[in-house]
Every structure is written in C-alpha cells, then in structure tokens.
Amino acid sequence: MSDISHVILYSKKNCSYCIKAKNLFINLGLNYTEKKFEDFKNIEALFEDAGKQVRSMPQIKINGQLIGGYNQLIEYLIDKKLVNFKGEPIK
C-alpha cells in the first residue's frame, strides 16, 4: 500500500458510488482528500483541477494520476492486490 500516498476523491451529493469509494478507502486505511463538485465555482474549475473533462462522479486521482470512476478504482486496486474481484479488501 506504500505506493498509494496521495488520494483525491472528486464527489457530489447523493452519489452512491462516491459513498462506496469513501467506505472502501476507510476500510483499506487509505487517507484521502475529498473535493466536492458543489464547492467548485464552475465546471471549468473542476476540469482544471481534475486535469480532464470529467462526466461522472466519483473521479479518483492517485499520486497525481486520474484513475477514473469507481469501477476503474476497483480495477486499479485489484492490480495492487488490495481488493478481490468483488471490490472487497484483501486481509
């Protein structure tokens, strides 16, 4: 897990996959910074911060790299051997 040091979660209100991502980070013991869609002054500011024109939430950046949404996060964590194919933490 040592190679995952800086996590940013772009989220918005009432987003079930945002909540799933937060819970997963907590269960894995990963610290993260949450940036809420509603806190950006405009959509361009969000695009600039994320580094891409994002179309859905959540969006996750790890160590400066935009991973993508929740499904891409699960794929990333499977590759790191931190979760199983169901997205459950591997103990």
Regions found by a protein language model. Give the residues of each.
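Terminal leader/tail segments of proteins
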Residues: 23, 27-34, 38, 44, ...
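Structural micro-motif
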Residues: 51-61, 70-71
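Non-catalytic, surface beta->alpha helical segment in thiol-disulfide oxidoreductase systems
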Residues: 62-90
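Thioredoxin-like thiol-disulfide oxidoreductase module
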Residues: 36-54, 79
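Conserved residues at beta->alpha junctions
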Residues: 12, 37, 64
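Local sequence-structure signature of Cys/Sec-based thiol-disulfide redox active-site neighborhoods
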Residues: 1-33
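Short alpha-helical
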Residues: 16, 41, 68
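C-terminal alpha-helical interaction module
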Residues: 1-6, 11, 48-49, 79, ...
